């Protein structure tokens, strides 16, 4: 083999190696660009999912959990005063009747209205929905009794006891959703 043939063979060999490296680099670059594009899309989808989750939690908290929780908490603060309806002291009895009429019943009605309007936000928790419906039923019976003019009979007297599990269930759900909301906000802001 002559020098010229060896030189031509070396040039062709180097050109083929260069071409092979260029083709490999081209495909590697395309793969990396596609990978970056997929990663970017996945990150964007995660941001959108997180944002939607934040919006849903915010709606649940602001339209259902916190308002119902606060109405129930207000009931907890004053309900014992209505037990004085049967007091021998006329001032205490009148005060209890007025608290029941002007505060407890409207407060119950407001809580029921919130529940009725926003039950769909109750996170499809069948146990919580059942407890909330017991509360709504209790309030309906309570209102019906008072609408008849009867101020002596309580819902318990007609087989409709107060659902003692309503406040703990709402409190637990509210605090759980609030914690989840704050965690998502913190993660989303980073």
Model regions and ranges:
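Membrane-embedded hydrophobic alpha-helical segments
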Residues: 1-48
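Conserved non-transmembrane functional hotspots
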Residues: 31-190
């Amino acid at each position: 083999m002559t020098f010229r043939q060896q030189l031509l063979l070396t040039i062709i060999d180097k050109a083929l190696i260069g071409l092979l490296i260029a083709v490999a680099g081209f495909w590697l670059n395309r793969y990396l660009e596609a990978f970056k594009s997929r990663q970017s899309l996945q990150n964007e989808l995660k941001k959108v999912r997180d944002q939607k989750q934040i919006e849903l939690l915010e709606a649940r908290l602001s339209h259902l959990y916190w308002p119902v929780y606060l109405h129930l908490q207000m009931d907890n603060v004053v309900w014992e005063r209505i037990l004085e309806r049967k007091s021998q002291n006329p001032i205490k009895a009148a005060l209890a009747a007025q608290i029941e009429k002007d505060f407890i019943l409207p407060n119950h009605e407001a809580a029921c209205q919130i529940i009725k309007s926003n039950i769909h936000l109750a996170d499809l928790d069948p146990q919580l929905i059942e407890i909330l419906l017991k509360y709504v039923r209790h309030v309906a019976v309570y209102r019906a009794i008072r609408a008849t003019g009867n101020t002596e009979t309580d819902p318990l007297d007609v087989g409709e006891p107060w659902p003692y599990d309503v406040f703990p269930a709402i409190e637990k759900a509210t605090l759980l959703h609030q914690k989840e909301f704050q965690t998502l906000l913190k993660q989303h802001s980073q």
